[in-house]
UniProtKB/Swiss-Prot annotation:
Residues in coiled coil: none
Protein name per its UniProtKB record: Tol-Pal system protein TolB
Species for this entry: Burkholderia vietnamiensis (strain G4 / LMG 22486) (Burkholderia cepacia (strain R1808))
GO annotation, biological process: cell division; protein import
Chain residue ranges for the region called Disordered: 411-431
Subcellular location(s) of the protein: Periplasm
Length: 431
């Protein structure tokens, strides 16, 4: 299999483009297939005044915590418990819960909701605080995700990612859709719909834009989609292939792979489409750039050594320092992604005839496969570095999967009924 084929420079098919901003009919569903070896027992009581609301905040919180693989939900019964109630923490500890959550959702005169909750440590018999959130019918889900994030951080010491978003491409029949959803696959919206392939979505650091590659003009072109306005604009339409956009940490620049002069090389372009600059100067294929979180390095895939491996160079390009090989486990490694703390490298390695997700410690060089799947591609770290989202195959279908970065639990499968889903990208923390 050639590097160009593996990296997804697909053959073109026919037809027209439809830009869209509506709700998605084909929606990703989450299947929880395993949990971590150590789980935190927590009881979340039904929030008061939830009956009849368009979204049940309590259910969203419980589902988020279960989906993380880090918590086990202790049965809290059916009786609502508001945050103002007097709580017998000893009784909840006796039921096996090391933490307890109480809350309420109250409709205000302006039609909005006030969502209040409090988190208790039943072991230390103390309050861990809470939040008071304002929401409307469409943002009640977000309120639930924010509550789960608060719980995750208070109890585990790591910022939660339930209120982040995903982007991915769903293919149903001959139609491709770039969708944006909550981290649980719900609340999906269509950013772009086309009968031409859409690949390589990449979130801006602000979480307000997604860069991607569309084949709608019979060749791959890089676009940026502004999510708040729904507008999009072309960033790179150079001669040949325009592919693999990756944002700089400051959001001002995109690294891209262009075949402008023949072999694909790494360039940078300003986010407004100007200032094109070549970074690599090899006679090989250099592609799939990705910035380190400090902005000092660009990691990329190259076959300059005879087979695809991952290299890194100064962000200013090879003129500022020679590229150095990073991966040495296996003979075929692609798709570099650096963790938010800059300590880990996720990539795809050809292993035993399949392709598996590996994680490498960038300080020691130690690398390990962390999945039990064999057709892995397109890894993307969660904003807290605790999970990796990737595309794979399960039951003969193209699906997404999320796995802890340390491989401590089996992947959770995200699939779509009647279609396939690929090209995942996990968004940053919400501003």
């Amino acid at each position: 299999m050639s590097l160009m084929t593996k990296l997804g420079f697909r053959a073109l098919v026919a037809s027209c483009l439809i830009a869209a901003g509506g709700a998605a009919n084909a929606q990703v569903n989450v299947l929880i297939t395993g949990v971590g070896s150590t789980q935190f027992p927590i009881a979340t009581a039904n929030f008061a005044n939830e009956a009849g609301l368009p979204q049940q905040v309590t259910s969203i919180v419980r589902a988020d915590l279960a989906r993380s693989g880090k918590f086990t939900n202790i049965d809290a019964g059916s009786t609502p418990v508001p945050e103002t109630a007097s709580v017998d923490l000893g009784a909840w500890k006796a039921k096996g819960a090391n933490a307890f959550v109480a809350g309420s959702v109250n409709r205000e005169a302006n039609g909005q909701y006030k969502v209040n909750f409090i988190l208790y440590d039943t072991v230390k018999q103390q309050s861990l605080g809470g939040l008071s959130l304002t929401a409307n019918d469409t943002t009640l889900r977000t309120a639930g995700h924010k509550i789960a994030d608060y719980i995750y951080q208070k109890l585990l010491g790591v910022r939660g990612v339930f209120a982040t978003r995903l982007s991915y491409v769903i293919k149903t029949g001959n139609r491709y859709q770039l969708q944006i959803s909550d981290s649980d696959g719900q609340n999906a919206r269509i950013a772009l719909s086309s009968t031409e392939p859409i690949i390589s979505p990449a979130w801006s650091p602000s979480g307000t834009k997604v860069a991607y590659v569309s084949f709608e003009r019979k060749k791959p072109i890089v676009y940026i989609h502004d999510l708040p306005t729904g507008r999009r604009y072309m960033v790179s339409d150079q001669k040949g292939n325009n592919s693999a956009p990756a944002w700089s940490p400051d959001g001002n620049t995109l690294a891209v792979a262009l075949s402008l002069t023949g072999n694909t090389q790494i360039y940078t372009v300003n986010a407004n489409g100007g200032g094109l600059r070549r970074l690599t100067q090899s006679s090989s294929i250099d592609t799939e750039p990705f910035y380190s979180p400090d902005g000092h390095w660009i990691y990329f895939t190259s076959d300059r050594g005879g087979a695809p491996q991952i290299y890194r160079m100064p962000a200013q390009g090879e003129s500022a320092g020679a590229a150095q090989r990073v991966t040495f486990t296996g003979s075929y490694n692609t798709s570099p992604r650096v963790s938010p703390d800059g300590k880990l490298l996720a990539y795809i390695s050809r292993t035993g005839g399949g392709f598996k997700l590996y994680v490498q410690d960038l300080q020691t060089g130690a690398a390990n496969a962390i999945t039990n799947t064999n057709r892995d591609e397109s890894p993307s770290f969660a904003a807290n570095g605790q999970y990796i989202l990737y595309a794979t195959q399960s039951g003969g279908r193209n699906v997404l999967a999320a796995v802890p970065t340390d491989g401590s639990a089996p992947p959770q499968i995200l699939s779509v009924q009647g279609g396939s889903v690929r090209e995942p990208s996990w968004g940053p923390f919400m501003q």
